[in-house]
């Protein structure tokens, strides 16, 4: 047992791992024959967390199977089965391609870059963020809206590879095996059907710049960003084996898809076309490369994204599940915040249904759920730190509709705050 010698041996205890005394640390936890301090506990937790980042179960070849990848995605993303399958297979094949390249050189396995198309708030970015947690290859996310052609104000396309290098601690070998997710890819569509009107430095120009790194080239990347440090040496990164996943909401694409195949006619004999009342995600399922060309992507760019995955609109049931089921569900997050005030937060089933309906009405998808909950809980979160006797807060449907205040339960009696009456 770790104790001090001499007169202090009975009074001063020491951590058995780092040797610090009980006076040097906040807590010292006693076991049957040893002691451990809070700092060593934190260190152990950090080690475990680092290990769990790449905790995918490996198959006999060291490659996670699509089902194993899908299982982890299911923990954080509700629905979107087709998109999950596409991503799981793509990442699995990416691992296999890297393993194959190291052992064989008789057949070259080409990569299949992916384009994710889905309405806003359907989970495109969340899928990519979840992949980043679980992969043991370097992963980075980039925003297409910040990119411009080289020589113009904004970020160069090479900055994407620089971010991947940073994610791999500037290990070029590891960076060349990484995965890049480019968000808001629809925002770099050509601004006009006429390709020659003006210089389009943030649209078609960026698509042209992305072509080579997506297909495979040796990119010269400045380690500290090229525009601020022009004299530095460049790192050479081969992008041939880097998998690119692009995602975008493609607002307006549904009209292009719906119009395809519908003949136009005028006059008294014209056929009256019924408006397409299908949901956006349902229309996206019928997308063809020609629709993307009409939207403003150039043919060469579409050709480098051979795998198309569409995401569905989130319905009421899916939004309710998103509120409650994932590991980082919004309801769980707010309940944890309230727990810090020693208060239980409870949502009635009807209240969650109304929150989901509001998000659908706003057409913001899952992204709008947080703002709705924030507005509902704002006054409560403002008042709560000053109310010592509150043990539970109940959110009912009237609260979501703005007709009543949340119900505060004080000790063993229920009481409104200030009164559960119509506003």
UniProtKB/Swiss-Prot annotation:
Pfam families linked: AAA_2, ClpB_D2-small, zf-C4_ClpX
Keyword Chaperone: yes
Keywords: ATP-binding, Chaperone, Metal-binding, Nucleotide-binding, Zinc
Binding site for ATP: 119-126
Protein family: Belongs to the ClpX chaperone family.
Main function: ATP-dependent specificity component of the Clp protease. It directs the protease to specific substrates. Can perform chaperone functions in the absence of ClpP.
Protein name stated in the entry: ATP-dependent Clp protease ATP-binding subunit ClpX
Protein encoded by which gene: clpX
